[in-house]
């Protein structure tokens, strides 16, 4: 009985070991699989078991290896059968080239060394310039100064806007005091504010009603905003955003509000911000304007620098400006880029308009400028300048409607001329009738062409803020504090001090847009001495 049971167990053990990869026993097969060697065989990798030496070397069983190609696509089982027993000395053991042995629970294992790839950081880009370092540092400093100067110019432009608004607020209070009976009952000297009020009344009479004409006021506002803007954006576009700012009652100055303040995201449908930023008027400096200077030689208009005769083209309009020093400038108008104000950087002129010339021979002139609004006196001043320089005015057309000259007949051109002429004539007649009795009692103003407003701007860059000096000192100080340009503001205070509140806007009357001082800024008309 015992013999039969032993035979059964031996047979079962043999079956199990044979099915389990033909190893003698599972424990030995497990240990043998932990130790293996790789050797190159016919372009492939052959994995063979490196068996441990058992006590009975005569008992050998077939060994199994796994042959795999380098691509690992197909694996093949290779069975090696030993026909003869091998002695311990004759047994060949395949080992790696440099095995590293490590003791782990009494077993010898091969150590596989894995080399980690070295990650090399990218080489930093070194800016190379042929210019010396000192020159590069100077360029960086210049760039910082340019940005800082632009920021300062914007603050100064805002100062001009603020002092103009504050002036209207003070002027309304002065006008209210002047209209009261108590003002005349008290014996006191007339203040500077009251003189400003009387100056406004006088300016409205001698200026053909400019302060009461809405059309002229709008054009004057456009001229002013364009002149003081550091970028000289087209005044026609600026004044639409100026109206939005006035209605918003914002406590921020206009240009700060427009560029980086609460209004930086305002985009009007009919006047988009992209057009506002694109259309910037070029203001010429003293050297730049020399290229547009025109002289008269033998009765013909000739460019002084290039000595070429003036020729008007059909697809553009030739514009001219006569400076206060009686220097003539002629150029081609480009809407939103180059216009009458470009020649003298927005400064005052004697005459302005358009002309047509062929080979230097003057054929037509027209006193039209939506920027300067020239009057008949300005036109006569220009004609006298031409006659003094021996220009034959016999065949020169002096009207705006003429079929022979396409420059005067383009669509919208005659329409603008008609509107401007009506805007100039209508208020003039009205004011003469209203103030007729008062004019009889006062002395008639005397025109003096030699004395003009202080609007001589030579530089083509920067805002035109000289008009701020003409305001009372108290308003100047308050305006500087409003835009944080006053040294009296503490460093810890905010940019816009709250005690002053919003800038007084909109103005008292929708028809009054700018003060008389700014209304006449740059307009080429004879000035009068206002005796306050």
Curated annotation (Swiss-Prot):
Question: Which factors induce or repress this protein, as stated in its UniProt record?
Answer: By hydrogen peroxide. Induced by light. Down-regulated by salt stress and treatment with mannitol.
- Tissue/organ expression: Expressed in roots, cauline leaves and flowers, and at lower levels in rosette leaves, stems and siliques.
Where does this protein have compositionally biased stretches of type Acidic residues? 85-94
Ranked from the top, the taxonomy reads:
Eukaryota, Viridiplantae, Streptophyta, Embryophyta, Tracheophyta
Biological function: May be involved in biotic and abiotic stress responses.
Ranges of compositional bias, category Basic and acidic residues: 56-66
Q: Annotated region Disordered: where?
A: 47-67, 85-104, 410-443, 487-513
Per the UniProt record, the source organism is Arabidopsis thaliana (Mouse-ear cress)
MF-aspect GO terms:
calmodulin binding
Query: This protein is called what?
Result: IQ domain-containing protein IQM4
What is this protein's gene name? IQM4
Localization per Swiss-Prot or TrEMBL:
Cytoplasm; Nucleus
């Amino acid at each position: 009985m015992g013999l039969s049971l032993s035979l059964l167990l031996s047979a079962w053990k043999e079956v199990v070991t044979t099915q389990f990869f033909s190893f003698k026993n599972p424990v030995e097969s497990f240990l043998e699989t932990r130790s293996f060697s790789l050797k190159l065989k016919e372009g492939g990798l052959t994995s063979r078991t490196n068996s441990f030496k058992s006590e009975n070397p005569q008992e050998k069983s077939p060994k199994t290896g796994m042959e795999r190609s380098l691509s690992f696509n197909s694996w093949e089982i290779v069975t090696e059968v030993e026909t003869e027993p091998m002695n311990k000395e004759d047994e060949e053991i395949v080992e790696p080239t440099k095995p590293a042995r490590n003791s782990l629970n009494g077993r010898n294992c091969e150590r596989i060394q894995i080399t980690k790839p070295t990650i090399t950081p990218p080489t930093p880009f070194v800016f190379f310039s042929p210019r010396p370092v000192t020159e590069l540092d100077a360029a960086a400093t210049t760039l910082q100064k340019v940005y800082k100067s632009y920021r300062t110019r914007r603050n100064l432009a805002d100062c001009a806007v603020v002092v103009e608004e504050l002036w209207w607020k003070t002027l309304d209070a002065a006008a209210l005091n002047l209209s009261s009976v108590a003002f005349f009952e008290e014996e006191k000297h007339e203040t500077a504010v009251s003189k400003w009020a009387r100056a406004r009344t006088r300016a409205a009479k001698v200026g053909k009603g400019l302060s009461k004409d809405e059309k002229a006021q709008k054009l004057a506002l456009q001229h002013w905003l364009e002149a003081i803007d550091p970028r000289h954006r087209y005044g026609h576009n600026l004044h639409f955003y100026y109206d939005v700012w006035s209605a918003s009652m914002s406590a921020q100055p206009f240009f700060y509000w427009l560029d980086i303040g609460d209004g930086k995201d305002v985009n009007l449908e009919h006047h988009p911000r992209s057009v506002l930023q694109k259309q910037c008027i070029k203001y010429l400096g003293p050297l730049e304007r020399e290229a547009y200077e025109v002289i008269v030689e033998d009765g013909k208009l000739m460019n002084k620098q290039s000595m070429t005769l003036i020729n008007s083209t059909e697809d553009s309009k030739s514009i001219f400006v006569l400076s206060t020093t009686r220097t003539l400038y002629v150029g081609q108008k480009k809407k939103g880029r180059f216009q009458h104000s470009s020649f003298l950087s927005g400064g005052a002129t004697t005459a302005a308009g358009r002309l047509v010339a062929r080979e230097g021979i003057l054929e037509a002139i027209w006193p039209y400028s939506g920027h300067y609004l020239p009057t008949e006196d300005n036109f006569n001043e220009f004609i006298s300048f031409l006659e003094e320089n021996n220009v034959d005015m016999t065949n020169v057309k002096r009207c705006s409607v003429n079929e022979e000259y396409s420059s005067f007949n383009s669509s919208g051109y005659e329409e603008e001329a008609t509107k401007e002429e009506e805007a100039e004539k209508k208020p003039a007649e009205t004011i003469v009738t209203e103030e007729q009795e008062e004019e009889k009692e006062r002395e008639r103003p005397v025109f003096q062409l030699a004395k003009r407003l202080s609007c001589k701007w030579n530089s083509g860059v920067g805002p035109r803020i000289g008009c701020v000096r003409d305001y009372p000192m108290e308003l100047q100080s308050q305006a500087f504090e409003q835009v944080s340009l006053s040294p009296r503001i503490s460093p810890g205070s905010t940019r816009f001090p709250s005690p002053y509140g919003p800038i007084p806007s909109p103005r008292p009357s929708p028809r009054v847009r700018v003060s008389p001082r700014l209304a006449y800024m740059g307009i080429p008309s004879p000035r009068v001495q206002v005796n306050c």
